[in-house]
């Protein structure tokens, strides 16, 4: 895919434009803006950027969550979901989900981390081996 060809319905934005718009979103915080653009903005596998601020990302995530919500009784609307995400007020997705939810341009993990453990104490040889077995299965 060349820089002139964009995925259907998406508009490519420059890094500088995305940083400028994100800096506004983050109240002038350049570090937050550059980190967001570098790590979490929607990109294709060539590094082309398709979101210019976390607001765009929140719309993407809200659209995908709404798609799933429709499978259940009393689903939240896209606007309700967006309101929960907007400005990271009530729901703050972790890095992997921010990058991956609704991202059809790259394969991304939706999990960040998880806890392993055993009901029994792990401070014995047997407990250590049980932990090792769990880690191998990951």
Mark where each language-model region is.
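Extended catalytic cores of very large enzyme megasubunits
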Residues: 1-138
């Amino acid at each position: 895919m060349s820089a002139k060809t964009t995925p259907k319905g998406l508009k490519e934005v420059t890094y500088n434009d995305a940083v400028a718009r994100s800096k506004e979103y983050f109240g002038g915080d350049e570090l937050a803006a550059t980190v967001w653009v570098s790590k979490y903005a929607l990109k294709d596998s060539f590094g082309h950027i398709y979101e210019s601020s976390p607001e765009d990302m929140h719309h993407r995530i809200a659209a995908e969550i709404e798609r799933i919500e429709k499978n259940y009784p009393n689903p939240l609307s896209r606007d309700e979901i967006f309101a929960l995400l907007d400005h990271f007020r009530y729901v703050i997705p972790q890095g992997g989900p921010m990058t991956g939810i609704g991202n059809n341009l790259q394969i991304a993990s939706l999990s960040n981390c998880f806890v392993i453990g055993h009901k029994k104490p792990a401070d014995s040889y047997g407990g250590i081996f049980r932990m090792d077995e769990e880690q191998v299965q990951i």
